[in-house]
Amino acid sequence: MGGWRDMPAEALEEQYSPSRWSPRLGSDTVIQAHIAATAAGTERARASVRTSLHVPYGPGEREKLDIYLPTDPAGTFPVLVYIHGGYWQCLSKDESGFAAPPLVSQGVAVVAVGYDTAPKGHMDAMVRQVRRSLAFLAQRYPGSRGVYLCGHSAGAHLAAMVLSTDWAEYGAVPDIKGAVLVSGVYDLEPILHTYVNDALSMSREVAQRNSPMLRVAPAAAAACEVLVAVAQHDSPEFRRQSQEYGEALRAAGWSVSLLDVAGVDHFDIIEKLSEDTYVLTQVILNMISRA
């Protein structure tokens, strides 16, 4: 078959260990720095932006949203929904508001989604939770100017799974106009053979059922615009996954752009969304302004 299937176990582990590929910091240090940067950015956002925190979209302890609101009182703003990474087993919405200030200042509401991470959460449940959060937002803000998904790493996987949702079973259809998928994993099968699955305990069936690469639907007439972004210093496997998922969407008729972001690694590619002038911040604002 070639590719990841032919890699020795140790090499595959390395490919799916994003912290080993950062030229800025050591493996452990870059993860701690990422948690610190996103937590501090979220604290700054909560201090400077009007918020509705811990809004429940379901009965579960983690089924809550943090909403960062622009000044528009009519609720006709566009909504960016941010889905955090952490390999489906760490981080939370409480480190996920760092991108709010530059977007809210331009009239965009930002929503950070909480979901049950492993080992409490399993993959099917996480996907359902994120989908339910979108249905909840569609009902809460029926007059919004569209929903834009933004997911990082495991969150990009969950955002990609949202794109293949049959909304009939969720009671509401969100008006998803765009998706920004940052340094994601779109085929879960290689993950089965790495340390990442120790906490997830996925079977091959679960991995296949929840792999966006295997769930690419033909684009609807009003299909949203998708940006697949990857870091210069992501691993070759992460870069391959982004490339192949973008190509699969394009082959199915979706409007897709691929962005290779220079000078960043798997972590600061998303951390820099706290900056007004950062390329991805500008891409998101441009996507929203075109809709």
Regions found by a protein language model. Name each.
Residues 1-291:
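Alpha/beta-hydrolase superfamily serine-hydrolase fold, recognizing
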